Curated annotation (Swiss-Prot):
Residues 11-74 form the S5 DRBM domain. One of its GO terms (molecular function) is rRNA binding. The N-terminal domain interacts with the head of the 30S subunit; the C-terminal domain interacts with the body and contacts protein S4. The interaction surface between S4 and S5 is involved in control of translational fidelity. HAMAP family: Ribosomal_uS5_B. Part of the 30S ribosomal subunit. Contacts proteins S4 and S8. Belongs to the universal ribosomal protein uS5 family. It comes from Geobacillus sp. (strain WCH70). The keyword Nucleus does not apply. This is Small ribosomal subunit protein uS5. One of its GO terms (cellular component) is small ribosomal subunit.
């Protein structure tokens, strides 16, 4: 899979979560901040990243840099996704279903950020299991990675799109 150049896209950033994390040392606790950020161009490209630093703005900056390195392309049909898919990560699972136009993005917090920034405006989703922001984002991205266009599936099977869709 080829890498997507973030400089050629107009990316929008959304901070999904900021956590205060502690490392316990002999003299007490060392506090740092961990940030989870989703970036996307609302036109079929989305990515997420994490960053950790002493201060919140630095953690967010690092997370944005990381997210730009992890961009994926999402096949979109009209305003929704081509087919139903289930994304997994750890104990988190998310079901993504295509929806008719005008439905809107029906998704909880972290998954909503990923889907909106990917440019999907009509979708149904249900998260099952772990609902921590990082697991939800990773499961959603996993689901989006599994999506295939009808043309790609037809080419893989050596058929035409008409034969495939019947």
């Amino acid at each position: 899979m080829r890498r997507i150049d973030p400089n050629k896209l107009e990316l929008e950033e959304r901070v999904v979560a900021v956590n205060r994390v502690a490392k316990v040392v002999k003299g007490g606790r060392r506090l740092r901040f961990s940030a989870l950020v989703v970036v996307g161009d609302k036109n079929g490209h989305v990515g997420f990243g994490t960053g950790k630093a002493q201060e919140v703005p630095d953690a967010i900056r690092k997370a944005i840099e990381d997210a730009k390195k992890n961009l994926i392309e999402v096949p979109i049909v009209g305003t929704t996704i081509p087919h139903e898919v289930i994304g997994h990560f750890g104990a988190g699972k998310i079901i993504l279903k295509p929806a008719s136009e005008g439905t809107g993005v029906i998704a909880g917090g972290p998954a909503r950020a990923v889907l909106e920034l990917a440019g999907i405006s009509d979708i149904l989703s249900k998260s099952i299991g772990s609902n921590t922001p990082i697991n939800m984002v990773r499961a959603t991205v996993d689901g989006l990675k599994q999506l295939k266009r009808a043309e790609d599936v037809a080419r893989l099977r050596g058929k035409t799109v008409e034969e495939l869709l019947g």
